[in-house]
Amino acid sequence: MKILRKNHPLLKIVNHSFIDLPTPSNISSWWNFGSLLGMCLVIQILTGLFLAMHYTSDTTTAFSSVAHICRDVNYGWLIRYLHANGASMFFICLFIHVGRGIYYGSYVLSETWNIGIILLLTTMATAFVGYVLPWGQMSFWGATVITNLLSAIPYIGNTLVEWIWGGFSVDKATLTRFFAFHFILPFIIAAFALVHLLFLHETGSNNPSGLNSDSDKIPFHPYYTTKDLLGIFLLLLVLMILALFFPDVLGDPDNFTPANPLNTPAHIKPEWYFLFAYAILRSIPNKLGGVLALVLSILILATFPLLNTSKQHGLIFRPVTQVIYWIFIANLLVLTWIGGQPVEYPFTTIGQIASITYFTIIIILIPVSNTIENNIIKL
């Protein structure tokens, strides 16, 4: 078996990626989230496939088909809630994964980092089109509001919106194409994830100390496969608790009402994992400005490798930037809270302050703290 896995053309790739891969001996549990994301993707594709067997992408029957899945299909309720809450687990793992990358300076591996940003954007797009499919009130109005933002693009905006809608409003054509996108995008994510791994294994993994670990590597299997399995079991435990005991805790009550174009919900808001970006969008009174801020809130992650001037790798020995980092995380939580609040004082003001803080920390405060710490080292 040993000879086969080292010589077989296909098994050799698996062997070099998951078995004999030289890995730093000191990577902590924060490095588990890559494998957890892979697990989440597998769960989402499998549950999604079974849901697609019973779902109909037609405005007249979409809502009923979801109710049919929950009521009449064997364990349909479980598959549906695993899929819905699996998306939340996916984004929790994603945000922790990105946060770990920022904290430990993984962005210096720029190819891996940039593919990761593409993965984040693609996952957000997949989740958005998926949220439209149950065709509840929040699905319909969320789709209307978010797609309508494209009309802010000069010259081609209105044409682009009608092209995406497939008509003059969100209707059957929109639902059908969103279902098609939602079906194909996870497989594109899987392909990008392989490219992400390919680039990571070109350079080798980062480690908590931020020091070169070439002299202290251990094989991935059995050490980290066992460690990853523990993480996967814990993830599945949390997911099952969510799906079985609190299936609707992260959903919106408005989505239990079928879509009605004549009745607007009091507060239109996306799923919790988009609230931080939604708060940034709403904090700018100008439509085009809001859309640009929304896009930049994610794309700004690409500036981390460019703005990094620190002589040290990661934040483990950098107390000044550590403080700024945790302020940044707290600020993100504030943005998430504000995104779910109505558009009125004092929430709008708090949202504007938090949005300015978000960009200021990344563009100004972190580079300044890098310079301060570099000068402290010279003393």
Swiss-Prot record:
The chain crosses the membrane at residues 33-53, 77-98, 113-133, 178-198, 226-246, 288-308, 320-340, 347-367. Gene3D superfamilies: Cytochrome Bc1 Complex, Chain C. InterPro entries: Cyt_b/b6_C (IPR005798), Cyt_b/b6_C_sf (IPR036150), Cyt_b/b6_N (IPR005797), Cytb/b6-like_sf (IPR027387), Cytochrome_b (IPR030689), Cytochrome_b_C_euk/bac (IPR048260), Cytochrome_b_N_euk/bac (IPR048259), Di-haem_cyt_TM (IPR016174). The cytochrome bc1 complex contains 11 subunits: 3 respiratory subunits (MT-CYB, CYC1 and UQCRFS1), 2 core proteins (UQCRC1 and UQCRC2) and 6 low-molecular weight proteins (UQCRH/QCR6, UQCRB/QCR7, UQCRQ/QCR8, UQCR10/QCR9, UQCR11/QCR10 and a cleavage product of UQCRFS1). This cytochrome bc1 complex then forms a dimer. It is found in: Mitochondrion inner membrane. One of its GO terms (cellular component) is respiratory chain complex III. The gene is MT-CYB. A ubiquinone binds at H201. Belongs to the cytochrome b family. Binds 2 heme b groups non-covalently. Heme 1 (or BL or b562) is low-potential and absorbs at about 562 nm, and heme 2 (or BH or b566) is high-potential and absorbs at about 566 nm. Its cofactor is heme b. GO terms for biological process: mitochondrial electron transport, ubiquinol to cytochrome c. It comes from Akodon mystax (Caparao grass mouse). GO terms for molecular function: metal ion binding; ubiquinol-cytochrome-c reductase activity. Heme b b566 binds at H97, H196. Keywords: Electron transport, Heme, Iron, Membrane, Metal-binding, Mitochondrion, Mitochondrion inner membrane, Respiratory chain, Transmembrane, Transmembrane helix, Transport, Ubiquinone. It holds the Pfam family Cytochrome_B. SUPFAM superfamilies: a domain/subunit of cytochrome bc1 complex (Ubiquinol-cytochrome c reductase) (SSF81648), Transmembrane di-heme cytochromes (SSF81342). Heme b b562 binds at H83, H182. Its main location: mitochondrion. It is a multi-pass membrane protein. This is Cytochrome b. Component of the ubiquinol-cytochrome c reductase complex (complex III or cytochrome b-c1 complex) that is part of the mitochondrial respiratory chain. The b-c1 complex mediates electron transfer from ubiquinol to cytochrome c. Contributes to the generation of a proton gradient across the mitochondrial membrane that is then used for ATP synthesis. The keyword Electron transport applies.
